[in-house]
Amino acid sequence: MLKRLKFLARNVNLKDSEKVKEFIASQNYTDGYKDNLIDAYCHFCRFYAIQWVKPKYMREERITKVPKEEDINKIISHAKLKYATAYSVLRDSGMRPVELGMLRVKDFDLETGDVYPTTAKHGAGRVLKLRKATLAMLKQYITDNDLTPMDVLWKTKRVLQNWGRLKVSIAKKLREPHLNQIRLYDLRHFAGSMTYYKTKDIIYTMRFLGHKNIKNTLRYVHLIDFNKDDYHVSVAKTVDDALKLIEQGFEYVKKLME
């Protein structure tokens, strides 16, 4: 939110709500991004008691392909230990990158592999689990750098920047341009989708992702057939649509776009 407010402040007087509205409307952004700017400005207006009529933008449905684990791992395998560990934690846990940046050593149980993140977006608290290989990497990283329980492990901005550079480099090196399309946030999509695929439990998936409202989990529901080499995706706009596709042999998988 702060980043969006700073962007607006560089381009328009935030105390002039009509100018802000005109500026946002004039930009060549998606309605979804414009709506995010509006939401950020609404917080500013409430804080400074500025009266204005909030414009409405209709978010367009956009399908993002869930990356394959083998493609995620291709990128991770070329990262240095610090970042390979960070990416593996995201892949295993489905945390948001911003939540990763708040983790301290004390937030990990180095015996069980349990993780106790601070949930972003006022979400519900949860306990997550790392794979044994990821836990081993984490222990090595902590030992190699003599980290103490209160040390922060990663900075979100640097993790994002490193992922952006790394995927471009690996996509070029392996001559697999589709790797360049995998965003860091897609690791959360992968983890959420696989959690539902394995459990068939939307409530468990909601808690896994740290949502308080199941509507957030169901906001973007995709049905993916994992039995094929390439995922076949069909969008379900209602629960009835979802049930019909399940009857056709699809697996019901949660796919999040936040």
Regions found by a protein language model. Give the residues of each.
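Non-catalytic DNA-binding core/recognition domains of DNA-processing enzymes
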Residues: M1-V53, L130, N162-L166
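Flexible interdomain linker/hinge and immediately adjacent N-terminus
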Residues: E18, E22-D31, A49-K74, T118-K121, ...
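Basic, Lys/Arg- and aromatic-enriched nucleic-acid-binding interface segment
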Residues: K65-P97, H122, R188
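Conserved tyrosine-mediated DNA breakage-rejoining catalytic core shared by Y-recombinases
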Residues: E70, S93, M102-Q140
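Active-site/catalytic core of tyrosine-dependent DNA strand-transfer enzymes
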Residues: R131-L179
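Active-site-proximal segment of tyrosine recombinases
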Residues: E99-L100, I182-R183, G192-T195, K200-H211
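Short, polar N-cap/turn motifs at the start of nucleic acid-interacting alpha helices
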Residues: F108-L110, K200-F226
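DNA/chromatin major-groove-contacting recognition/catalytic segments
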Residues: K129-K132, A136, Y141, R207, ...
